Amino acid sequence: MVTVTDFPKPSDEVVELVSSLIRFDTSNTGELETTKGEADCARWVARQLEEVGYECEYVESGAPGRGNVVTRLAGADRSRGALLIHGHLDVVPAEAADWSVHPFSGAVSDGYVWGRGAIDMKNMIGMMIAVARYLKRSGTVPPRDLVFAFVADEEAGGRYGCGWLVENRPDLFEGVTEAIGEVGGFSLTVPHRDGGDKRLYLIETAEKGMRWMRLTARGRAGHGSFVHDDNAVTTLAGAVDRLGRHQFPVVLTDTVSQFLTAVGEETGHSFDADSPDLDGVVAKLGPIGRIVGATLRDSANPTMLTAGYKANVIPGSAQAVVDCRILPGHAAQFEAAVDELIGPNVTREWITDLPAYETTFDGELVDAMNAALLAVDPEARIVPYMLSGGTDAKHFARLGIRCFGFIPLRLPPELDFAALFHGVDERVPVESLTFGTEVLERFLLHC
């Protein structure tokens, strides 16, 4: 192994890399006409890697400007399955007037890098680039092939990003058996049952399914002044009300059970699935409790209503869109409950269908995560958890790839990490970036 040291360490480069990445406005509105695209940012990423000797492939995924970059570093044992390290270049839009700094400034101040994407997820993109550059410059050969993928459109479901790549360019991921990406690896500080604090590092091993459902009610059109007993708006409103107010039962998956058991061991709290106050106990975890609480049960949140075109015309139809988040292995039960709630006079159709995902919390890759974290934070304990949202892991899982959320960040206990996702004044601590870069480097050397 080459030990030349006349080039920067990953931790020397990561802050400037993340700041530079944020300065690319890669806002994704969800509409091609108004989305800026990732092309300029993707080409910049490619230049950072090609500068040190990587061969990168730039791919536009289904639409002009939706840029992706993929490269591979050969490992010592080519017979082993490759490891994919992936991150998305797009970000959600930001309204500059709401921020204390410009959201695309990449400002470095008060110990933080500020801007849209600092947490979601240009922090990891910067860490990936920094470590990849170091491995190439040093001539380090990892134990297995590493595939680095920087992709588009995650914030809108990946149709013009990972979804397209998996469908049209699966060759880019040939031989990949495992993957790491968002959202996991961050620390959660909890009060220890014997006093003091304990840092848990949450490794994502599961995601709820994301299915957007359109409800349609049909009735008899007519004049608004008449008595009317077949009003589509009234029928739809009743169905939406029943669905939106319904609390689905608690179902603890393996991942959530393991998470609650680990937290209980450290804090002394009891997380009983049959307790009527389970939600209240989970809320004691602080800000992360919002994420964990959302993984205890299925959910169906009405988000859009459409009906009518004039105040005095009773429309012949009315529609609603419902954001459904479904636990792994629970789709059939969820659909049966929905059908009962909406009733026979409302039809449903799925307009987006990204299935749930869950893997086990074991194996050599999990051991490597644990070892890398313990080497930098001897007080670390890793625990599995489920993400209530969705990531590109849903697409990669279709290729048979075992996916984890692992972006190592040691966070200040007082930082409301969950609120920074898509939030105003999104920022990442500089110390968290340097910590994460060191952990990621160690992990990739022993993966």
Regions inferred by a protein language model and the residue ranges of each:
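Short beta-strand segments
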Residues: H86-G87, F150, I180-E182, T216-R218, ...
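Metal-dependent amide/peptide-bond hydrolase catalytic core
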Residues: M1-V4, K9, G185-A206, M210-E441, ...
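Solvent-exposed loop/turn segments at secondary-structure junctions
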Residues: T29, V91-V92, D153-A156, G185-S187, ...
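Beta-strand segments within the central parallel beta-sheet cores of soluble alpha/beta enzyme folds
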Residues: V59, P143-V151, E178-I180, D230, ...
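Acidic/His- and Gly-rich active-site-bordering loop/insert found
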Residues: V2-R116, L135-R144, V322
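Short pre-catalytic strand/loop immediately N-terminal to key active-site residues, enriched for Gly-Thr
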Residues: S109-D120, A380-V383, V424
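Sec-exported extracytoplasmic/periplasmic mature domains
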Residues: I22-T26, E50, Y54, R133, ...
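Acidic/histidine-rich catalytic neighborhood of metal-dependent amide-processing enzymes
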Residues: Y112-V113, I119-L202
